[in-house]
Amino acid sequence: MEHRVVMRRVLFSLLLLLTMVISASAQRSRSIGVAYYNVDKLYDTIPSTFYDDEAYTPQGKLHWDSEKYERKISNIAQVLDSMRMPIVMLYGVENEAVVRDIVERCAEDYAYIHRTQDYSDGLDFALLYYGDIFFPERVTSWHKALCVEGSIAGQEVAIIGNNRSSSIGVLINELGLRSGDSKIVILGSPNKLNFDKYGLSDHLAQASHAGYGNRVRGNRWEMYDRIISNLCNTTSCGVYIKHWLLSDTHTPKSTFEKGKYSGGYSNFLPVYIYLDN
């Protein structure tokens, strides 16, 4: 019964997505798409001396070799080319070389910003963007977060990727982003952030309350990643779903299923928002 409920929600989400895509296509000339994608442990095949990534090596328990790595790079590039978003925050890339491989595989012409995070798992953020749309000015690497300040169509905006960071509020204060003139877009999984205190809204809250999400936990969809901002000029927001991103069980098609290689994309689906230009 629960499986049928999950399937119905997926099918409804697909219909909802088609409506959004048609609407977004008409608006694209005046809207800017921003997406967040947790690519779920995209390691290279080289053992690190700074953290334990042994499982993601040819000799490790997952037998992570060049063929599997290249396939995942192609998979992520396929998703990015399908979305065609001018700005994409990635999380779960091991290093700059991985980011560069993704960008080189994409048909879309992305520039990128990467900073090494001091995580015990070695996973980083990277911001991909069209260089003629987003103009970065300042980059701040933070605990479990990356903030890139820049401008879109002459308007200053701070784009923050975060993964369970408990100090996003401190980052906002330190960068002086609390003023009414500061435009903020926070992408990823929030943790202990008082939205009201900073004048922020969770654009995916309504979808989450309705039972939709971007990953499956147990037998239920969960909105693990969010899009939070103080912007009012948004046209649409949602989870990016394509049939080829889903497995036969109608869950996100991941790279590994219960430790067995399945050659998929990620445990997570991308989330996105369109901003009025």
List each model region and its residues:
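Bacterial N-terminal signal peptides
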Residues: 13-21
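N-terminal, active-site-proximal structural segment of metallo-dependent hydrolase catalytic domains
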Residues: 25-105, 276-277
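Metal-dependent phosphoester-hydrolase catalytic domains
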Residues: 176-184, 191-277
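Structured beta-strand-rich core segments of catalytic domains in phosphoester-bond hydrolases
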Residues: 93-156, 160-161
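Acidic/His-rich catalytic or pseudo-catalytic neighborhoods
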Residues: 42, 59-71, 144-186, 243-272, ...
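Second-shell loop/turn segments in exported
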Residues: 61-67, 84-90, 114-115, 164, ...
